[in-house]
């Protein structure tokens, strides 16, 4: 069995973020939480994670901008957008930056765990192919 994924939650809603952190910690997932895009980018410069749970609508730097800068910095984490709503233009834009999944808030813990597991498996498979010299 593979190791449990590491997850970064980027969400400006303190209560929602705290609940998610607790729900994932109970399942033995290494989880980190930050409240803004700037903190997320700083965190990702110093720490690798498998999955980023990213809110799109945040004050200051939007989730779209966070995602764009993550990719520019070379972050290879799988990204799951967690948001109350996303407009079509925004959805197209985030897909261009490699969003792997999308969940509406509030989300069911089991569904979130399933999505995190799938994202972790995709990342592990992708990294395994690179290690073996395949693309």
Language model region names:
Residues 58:
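Receiver (REC) domain active-site loop signature in two-component systems and cognate sites
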Residues 42, 64-75:
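Short amphipathic alpha-helix used as the core "switch/output" element in two-component signaling
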Residues 35-39, 62-65:
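Acidic catalytic/metal-coordinating carboxylates
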Residues 47-53:
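Active-site beta3 strand of CheY-like receiver
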Residues 14-32:
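Two-component/phosphorelay signaling modules centered on CheY-like receiver
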Residues 107-117:
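C-terminal output helix
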């Amino acid at each position: 069995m593979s190791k449990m994924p590491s997850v970064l939650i980027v969400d400006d809603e303190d209560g929602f973020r705290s609940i998610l952190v607790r729900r994932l910690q109970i399942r033995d997932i290494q989880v980190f939480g930050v409240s803004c895009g700037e903190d997320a980018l700083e965190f990702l410069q110093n720490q690798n994670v498998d999955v980023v749970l990213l809110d799109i609508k945040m004050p200051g730097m939007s989730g779209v901008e966070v995602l764009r800068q993550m990719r520019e910095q070379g972050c290879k984490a799988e990204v799951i957008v967690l948001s109350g709503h996303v407009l079509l233009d925004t959805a197209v834009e985030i897909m261009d930056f490699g969003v792997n999944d999308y969940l509406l808030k509030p989300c069911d813990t089991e569904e979130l765990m399933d999505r995190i597991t799938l994202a972790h498996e995709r990342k592990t498979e992708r990294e395994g192919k690179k290690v073996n010299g395949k693309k």
